[in-house]
Amino acid sequence: MSDLSTLKLFATQPHPCSYLDKQEATTLFVDPEARVDKTLYTQLSQLGFRRSGAHLYRPQCLRCQACVSCRIPVNLFKPTRNQRRCWQKNQDLTLHLVSTIKTPEHYQLYTRYIEERHRDGDMFPPSEDQYNAFLTSEWNLTQYIELRHDGQLIGLSVCDQLGDGLSAVYTFYDPREESRSLGKFAILAQIEKARGLGLDYLYLGYWIKECDKMSYKIQYRPLDLLVNRRWMRLN
């Protein structure tokens, strides 16, 4: 295991921001040679790092602080009326934990989602290599939660189990099921899963107020925000 105090970090050159137009971003990466276990991953998550494939990263932008790490304290979470309706609407779904998503069924769902929902993003066009590199890791901490309706796969959530919570990595779903609000349901399901495991938090990544794709996270209350290296609770 690598030690947090001796961990090497590498910063990228400034590059166009993926979330905000006309902004430059700098990303801080953990040494890809570091041996990551649950303890180190938890410590890094508490410092605002996220996983993308086998890489752990955090924004380190010189002129912008728009990306704010956030997490839900699951035992204090109180759903809104809209969130309760979403939960009830999807009670006809079954959730399954699976050990791998390297199957044609999973990849076809991912492809359909990216092609219809994120044609303007850096994950388009989708490829199988990019899919595996983005969602899987070799740390044995990742869980894959299938959402099925009458046996048909309509959604999948990728999350990592930390020492103090779950980290929601990514969710994709069948765009034809948009009326179900499966992204919202997946967060609610992961909150319940974290509670069931006796964990304290669901890490949601970055809240970005000015970005529609990232601003929705503020709807989950209470919400902890990492501000000036301290977690502050927003009720």
Curated annotation (Swiss-Prot):
Predominant location category: cytoplasm
Entry's Gene Ontology cellular component terms: cytoplasm
Keyword Transferase in record: yes
Keyword check for Cell cycle: no
Catalytic activity annotation: N-terminal L-glutamyl-[protein] + L-leucyl-tRNA(Leu) = N-terminal L-leucyl-L-glutamyl-[protein] + tRNA(Leu) + H(+); N-terminal L-aspartyl-[protein] + L-leucyl-tRNA(Leu) = N-terminal L-leucyl-L-aspartyl-[protein] + tRNA(Leu) + H(+)
Keyword field: Acyltransferase, Cytoplasm, Transferase
Alphabetized GO MF terms: arginyl-tRNA--protein transferase activity; leucyl-tRNA--protein transferase activity
Location of this chain's protein in the cell: Cytoplasm
Family annotation (InterPro entries): Acyl_CoA_acyltransferase, Asp_Glu_LeuTrfase, N-end_Aminoacyl_Trfase, N-end_Aminoacyl_Trfase_C, N-end_Aminoacyl_Trfase_N
EC identifiers of the protein: 2.3.2.29
GO biological process, alphabetically ordered: ubiquitin-dependent protein catabolic process via the N-end rule pathway
Function as written in the Swiss-Prot or TrEMBL entry: Functions in the N-end rule pathway of protein degradation where it conjugates Leu from its aminoacyl-tRNA to the N-termini of proteins containing an N-terminal aspartate or glutamate.
Family the entry assigns: Belongs to the R-transferase family. Bpt subfamily.
Stored NCBIfam families: PRK01305.1-1 (NF002341), PRK01305.1-3 (NF002342), PRK01305.2-2 (NF002345), PRK01305.2-3 (NF002346)
Protein name: Aspartate/glutamate leucyltransferase
Native species: Cellvibrio japonicus (strain Ueda107)
